[in-house]
């Protein structure tokens, strides 16, 4: 962990300047060099990891005196996974500083703790860590078809797999079954874990599953979805982009179908 006073010893680093779910890039890449080179306030920087042997530093855009062009984190999905994960971490820490400005315990003003990535109340000294929202995401297979859905926010016609937030007192497997049934009307079986991905929009943790169709007729909930259909591997619509765990689930399901 890099403390505030240690930052001056960083010669060259990757600099993650973040605001909301946006990040600063230079010529399409995370800027690499010294803080002085980019006129960045290194006293406000924190190290969040290392990439290719160099430190990765996080700074909030609000701490800058200069205006910088920002792009969505989604535009970085093609970056190498270790780097994208660090950018996601920077986004989530930035969101922490904005969403936890005041202490939920006593209402006092929170400040960034110098020894760990948490906000700390200046009055009661309570530590508040980044809020992470657990979500499931699942690819459902029915014989040689995969279930894909379209959401109203997908303006480009993109289809993806079913996802939703975990409820209190619910297992991940129960959440998978509930979300699929609520959004599409079908029941699933053979629910099995696939992997996970931090999803900093703004602070979700996507826990991915594969499942098989069990019973029921497809009946989309049009308050949640624009469409839901079974697709064969040769009739796939535009799907979630490479770099997302949704795309990984789709590719795994297609691979499983083709290998049977």
From Swiss-Prot:
The UniProt record lists the keyword Hydrolase: yes
Binding-site positions, a divalent metal cation 3: 179, 183, 224
Chain span(s) of sequence motif Nudix box: 164-185
EC number: 3.6.1.-, 3.6.1.22
Record domain Nudix hydrolase: where: 130-253
Chain sites annotated for binding substrate: 74, 129, 197-204, 246
Name this protein carries in UniProt: NAD-capped RNA hydrolase NudC
